[in-house]
Amino acid sequence: MKIIGLTGSIAMGKSTVADFFRQAGISVFSADEAVYKLYKSEPTLSLIEYKFPGVFENGKVNRQKLSEILINDNEKLQTLEKIIHPLVQEKEKKFIDTARQQGEKLVVLDIPLLLETKGEKRVDSVVVVSAPLAIQKERAMIRQNMSEKKFAFINGRQMSDEKKRARADFIIDTGKDLENTREQVLFVIKSLLKN
């Protein structure tokens, strides 16, 4: 089984590309979705509540409040990552084990910080989703709860698009229309299944 590591900076179109892989019948593990689910389950909730008092509303993590804390405190960001990353990797391992048992030939790990965390060691091919900066920023700024400060913080934590592209086995440019993006995804699938 071949494992694709799908990555790219904020608002580059990773979710759209991941959906195109799914539509083509390829199983996708989303690190962001795993984190989102962890924010709703025990024991993660108790750990977050203990380490980050004041980020809970109605028994749930208020992601906006948590984000505001993390933007201003790198130590707290590292604390959260120490809680979340091992749990996400555990879910990723289960996903891969299940895919192998089911005889899948190709799977995708959608991991925003794949290269920053040296995750490329766990995959066979790295696919970087990329778009021009103006398009990236435009996409980011229409997101709910996004601000210039938050965009700069997130983008600053991530490896530059140029460096990511240099480390890619495949680059999917999402700066054009959706059909063009879909065709690029199908090309990647065909190329990897052929070898």
Swiss-Prot record:
GO terms for cellular component: cytoplasm. It catalyses: 3'-dephospho-CoA + ATP = ADP + CoA + H(+). Residues 3-195 form the DPCK domain. One of its GO terms (biological process) is coenzyme A biosynthetic process. GO terms for molecular function: ATP binding; dephospho-CoA kinase activity. It is found in: Cytoplasm. Its EC number is 2.7.1.24. It holds the Pfam family CoaE. Keywords: ATP-binding, Coenzyme A biosynthesis, Cytoplasm, Kinase, Nucleotide-binding, Transferase. Transmembrane segments: none annotated. ATP binds at A11, M12, G13, K14, S15, T16. Pathway: Cofactor biosynthesis; coenzyme A biosynthesis; CoA from (R)-pantothenate: step 5/5. SUPFAM superfamilies: P-loop containing nucleoside triphosphate hydrolases. Belongs to the CoaE family. Catalyzes the phosphorylation of the 3'-hydroxyl group of dephosphocoenzyme A to form coenzyme A. This is Dephospho-CoA kinase. The gene is coaE.
